[in-house]
Amino acid sequence: MSKTSQKSDKPEMEKKEQPSLLGPSLLGRSLLDRIAVRKGTFETILVPLLSVFTAFVVGSILIIFSHAETLAAWGNFFHDPWTAITISWQSIIDAYRALLTGAFGDPKQIGEAIKTWRTTGETKTLLDAFRPLSESLVFTTPYIFAGLGVAVGFRGGLFNIGAEGQLFVAGLASVFVGYAIKGLPWPLHMLLALLAGIAAAALWGFVPGILKARLGAHEVINTIMMNYIAFRLTDYLLTGPMIAGSGALPITPDIQRSAYLPALFPAPMRVHWGFFLALAMAALVYWFLWKTPLGMEIRMVGANPRAARYAGVRIAAITVLTMVLSASLAGMAGANQVLGVEHRLVRAFSSGYGFDAIALALLGNSHPFGVVISSLLFGFLRSGAARMQSVAGTPVELIRIIQGMVIVFIAAPEIIRSLYRIGRTKKKKAVAKAAAAD
């Protein structure tokens, strides 16, 4: 074979060996990458779901031990095991059935109310039948606002544990504008009261934000201290300058009707426009964090502050902005309560929404839509708890225990991964591959 023929054959051989852009290796790699991403997303969703399920399993065990009848049956377990198991199972079913009925309403009652409404046009029984669902949405609304606030902080690398205090000062500002200013028309007065609450909460979040950015003071300590200041400020104002009437009770005067967040349905249903405002804010937060340059900078700082600094992000400014946004969203929960539900402010108007928001953000993976879903769960639990206690005799504190167990399992996901063997196969394959390489 001549040299010229060897040279002419060489390019052809090289051309045959080069994989095409759509060759099986690149396609296979792309497919594997997509499968890996989807598997990671699936696990991200699966772990919170299993955390909730496991918390309810723990709750079921506590239900068994919270009834004297079941305890007596278990005392005779070795004599009559089937009775103990049957009574325990029935107590669990009764408790969770009452919980669901209290959260969504009685299906039979709803069906009869709809039938009556169709035949006679009478709406009272229909409204009564759907009242449990309405109450669940009333509880859900402040959860969404406060959960979004904590989630924004998490995305920016900040632990805003001061949502409860921010909620209180927002309620104070909104209720003051709501009752002190008179003569304004409805939309303007309502918006002014809502903005006053947001501004007060933003100011409350600015303080720990600037301390973190300028002095490096940890936001957890600062926000806890700001909580105490907010609580004591509320106590002072409710027993002094803002007290209503004769001063017999520590409450503010009722706000003007022009400052109300309007109800969606007639009484006794209390769900109001704030619920749809909360859903709109969730969509807005998603758009801001994932579709805008400023939102990307917040997520960059939260993911890797050093890399964000090298990329030219102003860390101090983003830190302050994140805390202000987080506090503003939490403050909307307080404004929502006084403008849409209570129409005045009392000492215990919050009932811990700001503290529960930490669990909501963790359960929702700090994603706005995840926060909405977890808020619905907590709202339904809180609404159904009273009926569970009155009908099934299960203590209402069980709901708090279930919520606490959800937090434990979310904060320590390895418990769930180990319990349900999530990711074990992948780890075993990696170990086997490393052993084979050695």
For each of these PLM feature ranges, what is it?
Residues 268-344, 368-369:
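Helix-loop-helix "hairpin" substructures at the membrane interface of multi-pass membrane proteins
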Residues 68-73, 154-170, 213-222, 342-355, ...:
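Short, non-helical or kinked segments that cap or interrupt transmembrane helices
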Residues 62-68, 93-180, 194, 198, ...:
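Single transmembrane alpha-helix segments in multi-pass membrane proteins
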Residues 98, 107-110, 223, 227-291, ...:
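Transmembrane helix-bundle core of multi-pass membrane transporters
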